[in-house]
């Protein structure tokens, strides 16, 4: 039986969930943030140590200013309200993505949360904000070229991965996407090469603990060969 210690989650379907209920898009994101809090508890109970969530992609900047501002407001609130819970649960918080494109007050809140939790563990929560997988690989390639310019032939994948935003973290055992779409949408392209993939039609706010646990059980029973 496979161990599932690290999962990546593409939290999709907030807006479609609200449309079916006659609610505003912003209400969908609010419910989505609540679902993340619930899922962290489910994951902890199931023995998952690292959760990486795709909260805001580089492409999401194309959304309306109102929606983007509201998403950042939710993120600030999450950091403010949940930081004590993360500390109590001995959870390290990390943020990956182009944080310097974010509002300065949000950058500050991220830095404070990271500093407060950096010496905790064994659990880790990683939130990808203003993140794009291709941009991450390009940035890692630049780091790699600087570090190993005189010894390129002696360096390989392990050395390259040290320049990724997720350096020091295990690759995901599972990537789960809610909302029905069946693609990774630029989420962890380097790290997901041997991840098990699950696409559920359930919209993110509607995900239940029962479905989440069933997904983990199904993946635990898959035959993972890692190319062998």
Pin down the residues of each PLM region.
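Flexible, compositionally biased loop and terminal segments
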Residues: 1-228
């Amino acid at each position: 039986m496979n161990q599932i210690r690290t999962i990546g989650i593409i939290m999709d379907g907030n807006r479609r969930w609200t449309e079916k209920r006659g609610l505003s898009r912003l209400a969908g994101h609010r419910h989505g943030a609540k679902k993340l809090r619930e899922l962290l508890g489910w994951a902890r109970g199931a023995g998952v140590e690292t959760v990486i969530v795709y909260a805001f992609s580089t492409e999401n900047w194309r959304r309306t200013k109102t929606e983007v501002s509201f998403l950042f407001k939710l993120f600030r609130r999450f950091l403010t309200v949940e930081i004590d819970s993360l500390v109590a649960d001995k959870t390290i918080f990390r943020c990956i993505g182009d944080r310097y494109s974010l509002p300065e007050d949000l950058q500050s809140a991220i830095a404070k949360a990271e500093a407060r939790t950096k010496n905790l563990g064994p659990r880790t929560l990683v939130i990808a904000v203003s993140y794009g997988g291709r941009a991450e690989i390009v940035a890692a390639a630049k780091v790699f070229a600087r570090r190993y310019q005189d010894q390129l032939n002696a360096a390989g994948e392990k050395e390259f991965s040290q320049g990724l935003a997720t350096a020091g973290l295990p690759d995901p055992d599972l990537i789960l996407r809610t909302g029905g779409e069946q693609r990774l949408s630029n989420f962890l392209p380097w790290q997901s090469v041997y991840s098990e993939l699950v696409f559920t039609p359930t919209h993110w706010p509607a995900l239940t603990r029962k479905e989440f646990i069933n997904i983990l059980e199904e993946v635990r029973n898959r035959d993972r060969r890692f190319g062998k």
